[in-house]
A protein has these predicted regions:
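C-terminal motif of bacterial Sec signal peptides marking the signal peptidase cleavage site
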Residues: 14-16
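C-terminal functional module detector
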Residues: 18-76, 80-83, 87-134, 138, ...
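A conserved hydrophobic secondary-structure block that centers on an alpha-helix together
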Residues: 165-168, 184-187, 200-210, 215-216, ...
Length: 540
């Protein structure tokens, strides 16, 4: 299947085994981080018309509980080495390396809940290695290992810490290591690094005692400085409490945003039309959500959350990389409330009713890799979960033992429902004046961003009143487009004139030619949300 990018403009928004082994840190420490950043920043030339930068803000290392258990031993330093184009070791032993150019920006996003706890449990002599759960977790009985892992997963889901192993000092230490690594590897103008982590809230269906849950995860990204202690689902499973904490951080001078991901398996809760506690949405909710969550991660290894065939029956590509199983289950997620295009349209309805829109977000892509680096290419794909899905046979994508067919082969249910349905997605694209924390973060705040499923095509869009057709041949096209309108992510103020749009796209030279450029329009009219698709340009 060819990878693609859908340029969606909606409404008025343009928009467990072994001990630990580390990888050698090859960072040059001859200068302090502050000296290095100041020196590099002084040499950067800003481009007022902006350049596109590609990055990944969803990456896990051994400090995530659901990575270490699957033999992941990579560190935050490995994340940044991979982003720079260096090879790092996959848990099964082979080396992985990014295809194409190095990334422009990146962030390590280990789970805040139990960050660094499993490595401590697996360290000889550490107090946590002596607790019964650790002995079971790193024992030899697969069934008991699974039960021990489920104990931690159940704690994350419930928000109730498992006190025997929950040591906040260890979490704080792992978080500091992540921050320090981001600061060490920050090279303004070359590689922008962000301190970040994942907030891992999970919903539960009423009356359902299974482990199935809806994904309400967010990646929390700090512009520059980060606090000594993070806020995880073991503090509260309510994302609105996370926003309150983020507001406090911002008041202390530390700007921060949360980026939701995998709304496709949120059981319809990510873009629900009520609050977490089931109350009606109001203006205050909408304004707080947009301040804290201006972006959503629309595509990644566990599927694409743009739309669904049931929501967009007239869109022939609405089934692209659809993944529907709830977390840790084979139960299908509810569709409504789980997809971006529907949410953007519903946001217009809510704005009419409350005076504010809670779903006026931009989009990015990311990998959600748990092995320090994403594949981004189906031709060289190592999936996500360490030793579980590193090869086509392990993923259930090819028959075992050299067989040519699946006849007589018993299919592994986890591979059948999960691994074989995942893909080599995705990347965030950001239009910014320069490759620095301040500039990249500001671009994300204003939503001048887009998502790709891996390829690095360049896409721009502007809306305005009075763009002339000869603008396409103007040497100053971009400058005039900015001067006469707003870019993707901006708000185009309504007037009595029909708007015009400037759309520009360039293929990734390492990937397939562009097949089609489309605009997707969503609007709210006469009590109904509607959607239409327009072909802007098509290949021969």
């Amino acid at each position: 299947m060819n990878k693609f990018l859908s340029a969606s403009i909606l409404a008025v928004t343009l928009g467990a085994c072994g001990g630990q082994t580390g990888t050698e840190n090859k960072t040059d420490h001859s200068k302090s981080p502050a000296e290095t950043v100041e020196s590099a920043a002084s040499e950067i030339v800003k481009n007022p018309n902006k350049d596109v930068f590609f990055g990944d803000l969803h990456i896990h290392t051994k400090n995530s509980f659901d990575a270490y258990i699957f033999n992941v031993r990579s560190t935050p330093d490995d994340v940044y080495r991979f982003a720079k184009g260096e090879a790092v070791r996959h848990p099964v032993g082979f080396e992985i390396k990014i295809g194409g150019d190095p990334l422009d920006f990146v962030g390590t996003t280990d789970h805040g809940a139990y960050m660094g706890i499993l490595p401590a449990m697996d360290t000889d002599g550490h107090p946590l290695s002596k607790v019964e759960l650790a002995k079971t977790m790193f024992g030899t009985d697969p069934e008991l290992i699974t039960q021990a892992f489920a104990t931690i997963g159940g704690s994350v889901r419930s928000g109730i810490p498992f006190e025997e192993i929950y040591d906040r000092d260890i979490v704080d230490s792992a978080w500091k290591q992540s921050i320090d690594a981001a600061n060490r590897h920050y090279e303004p103008g070359k590689l922008t690094t962000f301190s970040a982590y994942e907030y891992t809230s999970v919903t539960v269906r009423p009356g359902d005692e299974s482990f199935a849950g809806g994904n309400l995860h967010r990646n929390v990204v700090f512009e520059n400085e980060a606090p000594k202690r993070l806020f995880s689902t073991l503090d509260s499973t309510n994302p609105e409490d996370l926003w309150d904490w983020m507001d406090t951080e911002r008041a202390a001078g530390r700007d921060v945003m949360a980026i939701p991901h995998n709304s496709n398996v949120s059981d319809g809760k990510m873009f629900d039309l009520v609050t977490y506690e089931g109350k009606p949405l109001d203006k205050a909710y909408a304004e707080q959500r947009m301040l804290n969550e201006p972006l959503v991660e629309m595509t990644q290894v566990k599927g694409t959350s743009e739309t669904h065939p049931a929501l967009s029956p007239n869109d022939e590509w609405a089934d692209f990389e659809i993944y529907e199983d709830l977390l840790s289950s084979y139960i299908k997620s509810k569709i409504n409330g789980g997809y971006v295009r529907e949410a953007l349209a519903n946001g217009l309805k809510i704005e009419q009713e409350t005076g504010a829109n809670p779903f006026k977000f931009g989009m990015i892509g990311a990998s959600d890799t748990h092995v320090a680096g994403g594949a981004f290419d189906e031709k060289d794909y190592w999936s996500k979960v360490g030793i579980l899905d590193a090869t086509p046979i392990a993923r259930g994508s090819a028959p075992p033992g050299g067989a040519k067919t699946w006849e007589g082969v018993e299919r592994d249910q986890n591979a059948e429902h999960w691994f074989s349905k995942w893909g080599a997605s995705g990347l965030a694209a950001v239009w910014a004046e320069e490759n620095t924390r301040e500039s990249i973060f500001a671009a994300m705040r204003r939503k001048e961003t887009y998502a790709t499923s891996g390829p690095r095509m360049k896409v721009r869009m502007f809306g305005g009143y009075g763009y002339d057709t000869d603008l396409l041949d103007d040497a100053d096209m971009i400058a005039k487009a900015y001067a006469g309108g707003v870019p993707m992510g901006g708000d185009l103020v309504k007037n009595n004139t029909a708007p015009s749009f400037l759309v520009w796209a360039m293929r990734d030279p390492r990937n397939a030619p562009l097949q089609r450029l489309q605009m997707v329009k969503s609007w709210y009219e006469n009590g109904e949300t509607r959607e239409a698709l327009y072909d802007i340009a098509c290949s021969d």
